[in-house]
Swiss-Prot record:
Gene3D superfamilies: AhpD-like
Stated name of the protein: Uncharacterized 15.0 kDa protein in nqo9-nqo10 intergenic region
Keywords: Cell membrane, Membrane
PANTHER family in UniProt: 4-CARBOXYMUCONOLACTONE DECARBOXYLASE FAMILY PROTEIN, CARBOXYMUCONOLACTONE DECARBOXYLASE-LIKE DOMAIN-CONTAINING PROTEIN
Localization per Swiss-Prot or TrEMBL: Cell membrane
Length: 134
């Protein structure tokens, strides 16, 4: 990252934090990682309701929607690590295999680049390791 880009990025973060404070002062200290610890996985029934066939009877099932979400987050690079960790965990709970998750991430290398793919794979592997420990 160039210094100019880094400075711009920091200004954007600061601006976002100021906006959050203006809308809701309680959001000033919101930490997505704390949210991840609070709700490690969403119950399967809720997953199916939100991402599955409840609202989209003829649409995609929860597993497919979550794999698409993993792809979208991967393309963003390392900007949404807690969200990717939660989505990988949710996809596993919805029946996705580690191989399907990895293939989804590999496919995104064409759109997000190799560094984004590598970071997403590292995050997915850390989720797998946590799941294996439990």
């Amino acid at each position: 990252m160039t210094d100019a880009f880094q400075k711009l990025f920091q200004q954007m973060l600061q601006s976002g934090q100021e906006m959050a404070r203006a809308f809701n002062p309680a959001l000033e200290h919101f930490d997505m990682r704390a949210m991840e610890k609070l709700v490690p996985t969403i119950p399967a029934d809720m997953l199916e309701m939100w991402f599955g066939k409840t609202f989209n009877r003829e649409g995609l099932d929860a597993k497919t929607r979550l794999l698409l979400t993993i792809g979208a987050i991967t393309v963003q690079g390392a900007l949404a690590e807690p969200q990717l960790r939660m989505t990988v965990r949710q996809a596993l709970a919805a029946g996705a295999t580690k191989r399907e998750i990895a293939e989804t991430i590999f496919q995104m290398s064409m759109f997000g680049g190799l560094p984004a793919m590598q970071k997403a794979l590292e995050i997915a592997q850390s989720v797998y390791a946590e799941e294996d420990e439990e």
